[in-house]
């Protein structure tokens, strides 16, 4: 269960205004979670704050993969606090991977735009209004957050991890020529119908799924805008990126190079 202090502060937050026009754009946030009980209350609070202050119509869909740490129970509390029309819990019984989590989540999305992001506070919701402005300005099909353009950056990583990340991104740029500066990032805004079509085409699982989405988007001539973001390493919990994920990334990169 979430801590008493966190629950009190969340409960004190005003509910977002209701009764918006059905013709207004609506944004569905997909939040896959696994062992994120410490991070989930704060990321949801930040999302609600950002959307409410900008008068943006939204819903937050939490896809929990059977977390043993009580993440699901925290999500249930958040739905009670903010309302089941704003916080939708759509859990799965076990850990099935990031790509299938998005497939599961989009089935329940009622917005005409879908935002995907990490639940571990690596992606700050303060950038979402800028994503939306960028999409409107260029009428883009996709807006992707980038760590490698403009004033974007990474914070909290040691030098070794930064070099690995930069190196991986450099290699993918050479091999795949994706038309985007940050191929491995996971903070994006999609038109819902575009995301649905891309999901149908993608075959990768896990973290490679994000990379394939941009590559397939280029193949299908979808337009991509970019917004520089600050990526901050998680404060609570453990990183999901391990040796198996790195091997999967390399295999996925070679597969995409051979098939695209």
Curated annotation (Swiss-Prot):
Enzyme superclass (EC): transferase
Protein name: Dolichol-phosphate mannosyltransferase subunit 1
EC number in record: 2.4.1.83
Pathway of action: Protein modification; protein glycosylation
GO CC terms in record: dolichol-phosphate-mannose synthase complex; endoplasmic reticulum; endoplasmic reticulum membrane; membrane
Highest classification ranks of the organism: Eukaryota, Metazoa, Chordata, Craniata, Vertebrata
Quaternary structure and interacting proteins, as annotated: Component of the dolichol-phosphate mannose (DPM) synthase complex composed of DPM1, DPM2 and DPM3; within the complex, directly interacts with DPM3. This interaction may stabilize DPM1.
Name of the coding gene: Dpm1
Region (Disordered): 1-25
Record-listed Mg(2+) binding positions: 120
Keyword Nucleus included in the entry's annotation: no
Pfam families, per the entry: Glycos_transf_2
Annotated InterPro entries: DPM1-like (IPR039528), Glyco_trans_2-like (IPR001173), Nucleotide-diphossugar_trans (IPR029044)
Subcellular location: Endoplasmic reticulum
Alphabetical UniProt keywords: Acetylation, Endoplasmic reticulum, Glycosyltransferase, Magnesium, Manganese, Metal-binding, Phosphoprotein, Transferase
Organism encoding this protein: Mus musculus (Mouse)
Binding-site positions, GDP-alpha-D-mannose: 32, 34, 36, 63, 65, 118-120, 147, 234, 240
Residue(s) carrying Phosphoserine: 3, 9
